[in-house]
Amino acid sequence: MDEVLLLTGGISITTRALRALLATGATVAVFSPRGEPLGIFMRPVGDATGAKRRCQYKAAEDGRGLQYAKSWVFKKILGQRDNIKAWRRRLRGYSQYAESLAKALPGAGLHGAMETPRRRRRGQDGGQAGVRGRPTHPPVPPGAGRRSPGGAPRGQEASLRRDPQRGQSSGALHMYVIVVYDITENDVRAKVADILRAYGLARIQRSAYVGRLPPALVKELAERLARAVRGANADIAIFKVDKRTIDTSLRIPPRPPAGHVALH
């Protein structure tokens, strides 16, 4: 229930009491002895000013304030629509670029380029240690070593052990991944390049890397890149290529904030 305070003639109120009354949120109105409204005290809230309150009164009197508010909201919506259209055009360019790279994969001779950093990483700490952050097994070339009772070489058996955290074989590198980025800061670009190389991706263009990763590591890579470019003026698009084809039915997200990573 709203509390109404009526002050009749001959009643005075101190400034401290009036300030405390306004702080509670009560509306204090001043009337003439004839009952005519003279004004309303303004609450001491944030950026409230006399000019703003006067504009509110005028808007309430002639009804144009609602029209102005609707016009302002409509213009904001149109501005967001333009932002989404701009991002959609940019994303379409990323998609076309990645699709052209995917078509060039079979004859580009990229297998050796991707295998070199992967072998270097396996030689440093074995297995996927550079990705999971812990050593697993020493590098054993395929076919080397004694065979296990199941018939597979012990090196292959060790490399195909299931990762309990991901629930799949750590050696199942079967999906092509294309990473395209647009980064202005040199230090952030270098950080992103180091991360991509650590995951075994090979650089094929100035702002494009390609490699083969299991699906679980693709999501992990996207999260790590998002942390690396957080707060920077950077856009990164990750395209998962299955059987050297790209799904062109991409969802168009709203305009991303600074440091955006899109996973498709």
Swiss-Prot record:
State which Enzyme Commission number(s) the record gives.
Answer: 3.1.-.-
Write out the ranges of the annotated region (CRISPR-associated endonuclease Cas1).
1-104
Q: What positions does the entry give for Mg(2+) binding?
A: D182
Q: Where is the composition biased (Low complexity)?
A: 143-155
Extract the ranges annotated as region (CRISPR-associated endonuclease Cas2): 176-264
Q: Which GO terms describe its molecular function?
A: metal ion binding; nucleic acid binding; RNA endonuclease activity
Q: What induces it?
A: Slightly induced by 20 J/m2 ultraviolet light. Member of the csa1-cas1/2-cas4 operon.
Q: Name one GO biological process term.
A: defense response to virus
Q: Which UniProt keywords apply?
A: Antiviral defense, Endonuclease, Hydrolase, Magnesium, Metal-binding, Nuclease
- Which cofactors are required for activity? Mg(2+)
Disordered: annotated span: 108-167
Entry keyword Zinc-finger:
no
What this chain does, per the record?
CRISPR (clustered regularly interspaced short palindromic repeat), is an adaptive immune system that provides protection against mobile genetic elements (viruses, transposable elements and conjugative plasmids). CRISPR clusters contain sequences complementary to antecedent mobile elements and target invading nucleic acids. CRISPR clusters are transcribed and processed into CRISPR RNA (crRNA). Functions as a ssRNA-specific endoribonuclease. Involved in the integration of spacer DNA into the CRISPR cassette.
What does the similarity note say?
Answer: In the N-terminal section; belongs to the CRISPR-associated endonuclease Cas1 family.
According to the record's subunit comment, the protein's assembly and interactions are: Homodimer, forms a heterotetramer with a Cas1 homodimer. Can form a Cascis complex with Cas4 and Csa1.
What name does the UniProt record give this protein?
Answer: CRISPR-associated endonuclease Cas1/endonuclease Cas2 fusion
- Species for this entry: Thermoproteus tenax (strain ATCC 35583 / DSM 2078 / JCM 9277 / NBRC 100435 / Kra 1)
